[in-house]
């Protein structure tokens, strides 16, 4: 019986096609087709399937790949392995590894070359390197691995950041072959101090594993350097392990994934980080009442939202649920605030990002940041992950390709030790193929240091580092705010002013206010505007609750509530006229009083992964 025709591939160019076996050797055989969007799998023998189950592996679900070899010297086959994170029936992701046997040649060297050809092609596609069907696939096509500095706040959210980082983040980015150093922060503004003295030429990106507060420290540290114009071009990223995780929610939305929270959001953002790619990021330069200045990537809030944010700190152990509880309490004691909001309306044309700050998505390797000014002082990297083999959990491999763990296979070459369900005591450690991950200029894979065996001890009184809510340190460097007159000076005539009683005022840059609150559904990372939302007094508690509930899916503006207002602006000034209240910038409490801000389009660079996919069910 002739095998069925090949499955129709996606509307993209086929890169490779071939026949592979599985492990063990007497298992099924498969026809594999690699396109720019997916790996197509069709079983050929013993029973061909016209539409095999799990026959399409989207590259959006793949973190990395590798080649393996048998521990048996008589086995001349080589093995091609991919690490995937498909969505389960309940929506969450689960790790699955698929392994295929390259056995079409008579010698191990030839089979190994074929397995490496597939691994090289898949790695190039994952990292954004364009390939064509008639192109020769060689290791020289592989981009250099970016070297990432990963900062973990072990006190963030519910205090689970370190454990989640080791359980989910480290294994995935190790599978992707990324090079990184892992550092635990130990106090407030520790991350800011680190990046202020960082040698930028040693890194291609800084990633925070926490909530939005740690990235706020990093961003303001980069902009508080004499070489801020170079420093702010350092790509920054966030892996959510905090309470709000607003920017991570926006990154998840930008990547085309459905809205999720918790570990699912962490896995989605980790996958996007592994894929590479970045996007220009607008920043707000915020001038406070004292004249000091800080920079925001998220929001300025006054009224109900800032009250909920700050007053819910006492429920920090609840994680993101603290905001729900805080909102309920806030609705029960709803306050109004008198103030004056003035803004410079955005032009009809979208603002263009600053030239030179955009990273081409076609090349996944990150642009090297320029070296810092000679005057910068290098701070020691405390609790760094740097010098010992990095443990990488390896659960059982699943079909198609490998229906069971592979006790008799090992990854080719030498490198970090991989532990898990790969055999009994005395088996050789698993290690990545040295020819696969990178070109000859590749950086060394990250490794673990003895001082990073666990998170620092948390205060016994509360279990978490108590937030100080002191005013953030002001930045003395940064771009000129050419749209803003000094606070207290009259505003130009082209500004619009609204005065009255407000329940809340929000100026937000990205789409999300929390991981599951889409406050500005049409916002983009580089649209050049701040999205102003306000709610006037007179609104009922029920109507405000409806707005908050609709905000989960970004439908609040379609409610037609007359108390809800919106404007897109390039700059704004907020003057609270009520003597007492709370103001927050990116969730951090700042001094109360007049405040103004200006958008600086595309000033920073955000690690986002590829964009353009539709939300996945």
Swiss-Prot record:
Post-translational modification: Phosphorylated by PKD on Ser-384 and Ser-386 upon PMA treatment. Phosphorylation induces export from the nucleus to the cytoplasm. Phosphorylated by MAPK1 and MAPK2 at Thr-578, phosphorylation is induced by agonists such as EGF and PMA and increases kinase activity.
Keywords: ATP-binding, Cell membrane, Cytoplasm, Endoplasmic reticulum, Kinase, Lipid metabolism, Lysosome, Membrane, Mitochondrion, Mitochondrion inner membrane, Nucleotide-binding, Nucleus, Phosphoprotein, Transferase
Motif Nuclear localization signal in this chain: 87-95
Region of interest: Disordered: 371-472
All copies of domain DAGKc, residue ranges: 143-290
Stated consequence of mutating residue 213 to E: Abolishes sphingosine kinase activity. Decreases apoptosis induction. Abolishes sphingosine kinase activity. No effect on endoplasmic reticulum location increase upon serum starvation
Designated name of the protein: Sphingosine kinase 2
